[in-house]
Amino acid sequence: MAEEVKFSPYEDAVAGLVVQILGRTGIAGEVTQVKIKILEGRDKGRVLTRNVKGPVRLGDIVMLRETEREARRITAR
């Protein structure tokens, strides 16, 4: 009998700590732009700007699939 292999969606994810909330973005304000400090992995200690969908507050831990991309700054038109 073959052994079943289960893949977790967080298998390759890296933990990051929300250190600052920059503002809301998106057409209806459904996305929050935050600064995240990487807690583990190759980029440990690096601070990224990312967009987070859903509720988020200071001190939350978010799981990032990759740590290469950064969000563009929110600019007023």
Swiss-Prot record:
Keywords noted in UniProt: Ribonucleoprotein, Ribosomal protein
The organism of origin for this protein: Pyrobaculum aerophilum (strain ATCC 51768 / DSM 7523 / JCM 9630 / CIP 104966 / NBRC 100827 / IM2)
Listed name of the protein: Small ribosomal subunit protein eS28
Domain of life, per lineage: Archaea
GO MF terms, alphabetically ordered: structural constituent of ribosome
Family statement: Belongs to the eukaryotic ribosomal protein eS28 family.
Signal peptide annotation: none
Entries under Pfam families matching the protein: Ribosomal_S28e (PF01200)
GO biological process: maturation of SSU-rRNA; ribosomal small subunit assembly; translation
NCBIfam families membership: PRK04007.1 (NF003080)
Gene for this chain: rps28e
The keyword ATP-binding belongs to this UniProt entry's keyword annotation: no
Cellular component GO terms, alphabetical: cytosolic small ribosomal subunit
